[in-house]
Amino acid sequence: MNRTAGLALLLILLAGCTSSQPTSQVTATPTKAAHTFAGGCAGTVLTDGEPPVWAQGGWNHTKGTAWGVPWALGTQGNTVAYVFATQLVAVQSPRSDGTNNKILWESKDNPSGDGVTVEGRPLGQTNPVVKIAGGPSIVDVPAAGCWTFQLSWTASGQHTSTINLEVLPAGTPPSKPA
């Protein structure tokens, strides 16, 4: 067999091995674009996008709309902080606008936040330390800046995750989400 005939036979065989299925057209579902908000720091992002399914229990939410409360995902993808306060402000609640530094802390293993402990400290520092129970909490810290909140819990072993949140100076009004 000559070289040209061999090449032609190879092409015919290869053509028979491929399938030509019709391409399906994907129709996009309209969704509202997720926004990011001031309040996260050192790699943590606050968003109104849809949180992980495990963190959605107890919420009444219409698919395709912005999430009602800004939230941040922890470092291992296994914790969420719902920041009702939109932004934290240093010192004791209530803040100058009459609201509180309220956060709901959840872990994938404990979505209610039960059994979760939270320790907050200024980023890269050992002190001061603020200890908070998981679940819904008022999070008052003594100073402005980027704070690291380490969440820990025991469920089939010891687990930790980190969420970094910016704290505004005392007396600063937090920004309102658009």
Predicted features, each with a name:
Residues 25-142, 146-178:
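Contiguous segments within soluble domain cores/interaction surfaces
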Residues 18-20:
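Bacterial signal peptide processing site
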Residues 13-16:
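C-terminal motif of bacterial Sec signal peptides marking the signal peptidase cleavage site
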Residues 1-6:
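Bacterial N-terminal signal peptides that target proteins for export
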